[in-house]
From Swiss-Prot:
<keyword id="KW-1015">Disulfide bond</keyword>
<feature type="disulfide bond">
    <location>
        <begin position="139"/>
        <end position="155"/>
    </location>
</feature>
<feature type="propeptide">
    <location>
        <begin position="18"/>
        <end position="34"/>
    </location>
</feature>
<comment type="function">
    <text>Has antifreeze activity to protect fish blood from freezing at subzero sea water temperatures. Binds to ice crystals and inhibits their growth. The thermal hysteresis (TH) activity, the ability to lower the blood freezing point, is approximately 0.45 degrees Celsius at 0.15 mM for this protein.</text>
</comment>
<dbReference type="InterPro" id="IPR050111">
    <property type="entry name" value="C-type_lectin/snaclec_domain"/>
</dbReference>
<dbReference type="InterPro" id="IPR001304">
    <property type="entry name" value="C-type_lectin-like"/>
</dbReference>
<feature type="disulfide bond">
    <location>
        <begin position="107"/>
        <end position="138"/>
    </location>
</feature>
<keyword id="KW-0732">Signal</keyword>
<protein>
    <recommendedName>
        <fullName>Type-2 ice-structuring protein</fullName>
    </recommendedName>
</protein>
<feature type="signal peptide">
    <location>
        <begin position="1"/>
        <end position="17"/>
    </location>
</feature>
<feature type="disulfide bond">
    <location>
        <begin position="73"/>
        <end position="163"/>
    </location>
</feature>
<dbReference type="Pfam" id="PF00059">
    <property type="entry name" value="Lectin_C"/>
</dbReference>
<feature type="disulfide bond">
    <location>
        <begin position="127"/>
        <end position="149"/>
    </location>
</feature>
<keyword id="KW-0430">Lectin</keyword>
<dbReference type="InterPro" id="IPR018378">
    <property type="entry name" value="C-type_lectin_CS"/>
</dbReference>
<dbReference type="GO" id="GO:0005576">
    <property type="term" value="C:extracellular region"/>
</dbReference>
<dbReference type="InterPro" id="IPR002353">
    <property type="entry name" value="AntifreezeII"/>
</dbReference>
Length: 168
């Protein structure tokens, strides 16, 4: 009797899960159903982008101003990269060469840094004596230094850039 009760409960749970869209069944030739959990699908990035965590990154080698670099990233469906941890900093450091624009800006109010993607500035790795908070130096770059620390520069300078967007 206990076995029958357990089987009925299991069948009801699976039926409800399938009804709620949690399971996607694939029938085999023997008529068995092999459940595939949708929440377990792999995250992917478009061609040319690399996956790290839940975000995709695109290294743009063409040198351009900070404003054009941001517009280029937006055109690709993202923004200049925001960096939220040492792990992300190290990942980006490994996929870029030289100086690159990243998504930080303080052009509206000197010293009030924000990311172009709207996420909070919750991690910082400024170079020593930076930022200098001069309003003309209001765009953020990752330097070519070994540690790839951040520096504030005038936005009209031309550099490569790194874009980021959510993986799908």
């Amino acid at each position: 009797m206990l076995t029958v009760s357990l089987l009925v409960c299991a069948m009801m749970a699976l039926t409800q899960a399938d009804h709620d869209g949690v399971l996607k069944g694939t029938a085999t030739e023997a008529g068995e159903v092999s459940p595939v959990f949708r929440s377990r699908r792999a995250l992917v990035c478009p061609a040319g982008w690399t996956l790290h965590g839940q975000r995709c990154f695109y290294s743009e080698a063409t040198a351009m101003t900070w404003d054009l670099a941001e517009a280029n990233c937006v055109n690709k469906g993202g923004h200049l990269a925001s960096i939220h941890s040492l792990e992300e900093q190290l990942y980006i450091k490994d996929i870029v060469a030289g100086i690159v624009w990243i998504g930080g800006s303080a052009c509206k109010v000197a010293g009030a840094w924000s990311w172009t993607d709207g996420t909070p500035v919750d991690y910082r790795t400024w170079c020593p004596t930076k930022p200098n908070d001069i309003l003309s130096d209001c765009c953020m770059q990752m330097t070519a230094a070994v540690d790839k620390c951040w520096d504030d520069l005038p936005c009209p300078a031309s550099h490569a850039s790194i874009c980021a967007k959510a993986a799908i």
